[in-house]
Swiss-Prot record:
Entry similarity comment: Belongs to the YqgF nuclease family.
Name of the featured protein: Putative pre-16S rRNA nuclease
GO molecular function: nuclease activity
Family annotation (Pfam families): RuvX (PF03652)
Annotated CDD domains: YqgF (cd16964)
Known role: Could be a nuclease involved in processing of the 5'-end of pre-16S rRNA.
Keyword Hydrolase: yes
Family matches, as SMART domains: YqgFc
Length: 138
């Protein structure tokens, strides 16, 4: 059972995938957004390639737990994605995942240019790994 992790942004979508046992998350790619149809097609292709059963998408919340405008955009995108792909989509709190991704890359001595290219993919890994850890640590 493979699970896809998404970090949906305005310009890019970070993508991660679980191992077949659902224990660990690995980065797949960062999709440069063009239009809704192409974005969904790219995600669909990845789902087919990895035989994905469900999707976990990061839900951007404010630090006080409330939902803001970006949360609405992500939820709207995921609602459309769910209809198109007919897969379960779990919304997962993504607070501080991008901060954690940046911190890990800085500690790894990656240049700013390299960090910019992969930060969303790394954030998707954090989102998916957080979900996987919650499922298997019950």
């Amino acid at each position: 059972m493979r699970i896809l992790g998404l970090d949906v942004g305005d310009r890019t979508i970070g993508v991660a995938i679980s191992d077949p046992l659902g224990w660990t998350a690995q980065g797949v790619k960062t999709i440069k957004r063009s239009n809704l149809k192409n974005d969904i097609k790219e995600i669909e292709d990845i789902c087919n390639e990895y035989k994905v059963d469900k999707i976990v998408s990061g839900l951007p919340k404010n630090m006080n737990g409330t939902l803001g405008p970006q949360s609405e955009k992500v939820t709207e995108f995921c609602d459309i994605l769910k209809k198109e792909l007919e897969k379960e989509i779990i919304m997962w709190d993504e607070r501080l995942t991008t901060v954690a991704a940046h911190k890990a890359m800085i500690e790894g001595d990656l240049s700013r240019a390299k960090r910019k290219k992969i930060v969303d993919k790394i954030a998707a890994i954090y989102i998916l790994q957080g979900y996987l850890d919650s499922v298997y640590n019950k």
